[in-house]
Amino acid sequence: MIEIRVIGMPAPQGSKSFKGYRNGRGIMIESSKKVKPWREAVKWAAIETKVMMPGNDPVVCEMVFSLPRPKSAPKSVQHPFRKPDLSKLVRSTEDALTEAGVWGDDARVVGFGNTRKVFAGGSEQDSMTVPGAV
């Protein structure tokens, strides 16, 4: 098992905005400005960990995203159930791991184990004290 800890605000990768044409091709940019810093944080955490998974073997991922607890959330609420969308958090993180060279293509991911959102500083296993991901 390989573990990478990333400190930073997890950001979903989702919609792209159309910004016109250049050389006959459509220009699409990421709608969220938070994605780039998150992907950079994941990329550098992976590079510092020196994790590489050469070959073409299938991979099963587990990702636990620690998000800040909103002040309006009652203490009885154990998991973040609003935005950001878990599948979009996974997408941005997978793409960053591909950029970092952890694997050649995130198509190698064949399944997800314990992948979830938790509140930072909570009592959940793998919950970080600050926003980030394990």
Residue ranges of predicted features:
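Acidic, proline/glycine-enriched N-terminal capping motif
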Residues: M1-V134
